[in-house]
Amino acid sequence: MSEVTLQAFLDDWAGADPLRCAVAATVERLAEAGVSIAELVARGPLAEDFGKVRGDEANAGGDAQKELDVIAEEELVDALGRAPVAFLASEESETPIPLDPHGRVVVAVDPLDGSSNIDTNVSIGTIFSILPYDLEQHPDPAAALLQPGSAQIAAGFLVYGPATILVSSLGQGTQVFVFDHDTATFILAREKVEIPAATKEYGINQSNVRHWAKATQRYIDDCLAGKDGPRGKDFNMRWVGSLVADAFRIFTRGGVYLYPGDSRKGYADGRLRLIYEANPIAFVTEQAGGAATDGTTRILDIQPKQIHQRIPLVFGSREEVAHIASYY
């Protein structure tokens, strides 16, 4: 069986449909930028001090901004400037970045998820969401970006690790592509990802237990009780601290991920952003048979109120996600 490239896969999906062709071109440019970012990441300490914080600077969400965060955004702006993208919303920029005034889509990105791990050689990545754009319907670019996640045409994430991997969905299942250095192309590795419905593995930053709501504490306590507790089975706990790395593990072998809100200042709604982290992750998760909520409400049903809005996130194996909701 011959290998299927990302371009061939996108061309077959898009056909002659103008909007689909715009989406396909956008995904190709995102993948292109991802390769450039992966090459920078791979140089590690041999390159500039990419893990260095930019003085007292913070991004639009208030997080410390590192050199590679900014460089990754620049790579994406350059690549998407050659795609039919009207506006780009980024974690690193306060307001939408205008690109093609005649663009058919808008894109929201986290240019470099997990950048706190830059210096430790842990997998990091890029998360993206693609939404339809109509100038007459959305003369304000912010309004175009504040569509619910269910309106996404495509979404996905790139992982910069031992392999450079693209996990994406065009609304017809979730696919995994791997970058082949010999041919300089992304090759289809898994055509239909299916997240197992049940799991014995969860991921959460357990050091924050004292700050959690009682519902979150009870769920984790029941998991820790193992086969002798109410769950009747032993659980493993895995936590990388890089959303794309934790997500790819779930897409590979199942599991559930929790980033709840807690009682710390600034953490009432967690730390993840709705439109460029939770929404795209929820989209590819559901397309792979999983589920994604804020603890109780389906992520893709939530109406965004602002571009950098935060949201608690629970996603992964659908039976476990549903079980977690029963605690709230």
UniProtKB/Swiss-Prot annotation:
One cellular component (GO) term of this entry: cytosol
Chain positions recorded as substrate binding sites: 113-116, 205, 257-259
Source organism, top-level taxon: Bacteria
Catalytic activity, as annotated: beta-D-fructose 1,6-bisphosphate + H2O = beta-D-fructose 6-phosphate + phosphate
EC numbers for this chain: 3.1.3.11
SUPFAM superfamilies with a match to the protein in the record: Carbohydrate phosphatase
UniProt pathway: Carbohydrate biosynthesis; gluconeogenesis
Cofactor binding description: Binds 2 magnesium ions per subunit.
Keywords carried by this UniProt record: Carbohydrate metabolism, Cytoplasm, Hydrolase, Magnesium, Metal-binding
Molecular function via GO: fructose 1,6-bisphosphate 1-phosphatase activity; magnesium ion binding
A Pfam family annotated for this UniProt entry: FBPase
Binding site for Mg(2+) 2: 110, 113, 277
Residues where Mg(2+) 1 binds: 91, 110, 112
Cellular compartment(s): Cytoplasm
Subunit structure: Homotetramer.
HAMAP family: FBPase_class1
Similarity comment: Belongs to the FBPase class 1 family.
The name this protein goes by in its record: Fructose-1,6-bisphosphatase class 1
